[in-house]
């Protein structure tokens, strides 16, 4: 959809997943760090399956929104000797690949003895690459600001593609996972930024899309967005660490208290038995 909602919708999807990953991966990392064997628990497998299902659901919602809005193509690709709403079809194609990624995620953890390890990462990398590939040819012939603000998104997309491909080999690498998380948060916030710049809501003035000062500002703004993504990821990582540390200390305190009660009970029993003998 070539409007504000058409950019806010995918931006919200990516931002939700980015924020979720910024909590999930630190939790997973600290949990596995305390285990002798680096294996997923049943609870973690269920979380991964649910995440894949949510990803597929988001993709279906995105496709339906692109196809069946009032001015959408309604599944008509070619009508009356011309292509129909190709921009909506491009967005639908992007959602389609992320939907496939969600399905593969579910299969990977439902049938982990059959599905090769790393296939979920390969398909996710493919989905992100397809998104970047579509966006590269998405803005040809448009004003400079429109082209530039979309092209900046390619850096995060192709960077994420490379990072995810490395995860196929370096499985459960927290650095690569957090790097991917920051890029996804950046992608989500940047979709919103594109919507505010190209389709200003609330009656705000439109941007001059031929002004090179606007192009320079948007480049700087992109860097600010990534800094915010880094800060969000770092803050959530720290909060998870503090939360788990507090829970662990509380659990250790309860164990020590129970052991102390047992020792006191044993001591009292010994005294009573000694007094009975006397």
UniProtKB/Swiss-Prot annotation:
Name this polypeptide is given: Transmembrane protein 45B
PANTHER family hit by this protein: EPIDIDYMAL MEMBRANE PROTEIN E9-RELATED, TRANSMEMBRANE PROTEIN 45B
Coiled coil (residue ranges): none
Keyword Cell inner membrane: no
Family that this chain belongs to: Belongs to the TMEM45 family.
Modification Phosphoserine, positions: 273, 275
Membrane topology category: Multi-pass membrane protein
Annotated GO CC locations: endosome membrane; Golgi apparatus; lysosomal membrane
GO biological processes: innate immune response
Protein location: Endosome membrane; Lysosome membrane; Golgi apparatus, trans-Golgi network membrane
Major localisation: membrane
Source organism superkingdom: Eukaryota
The keyword Transmembrane is annotated on this UniProt entry: yes
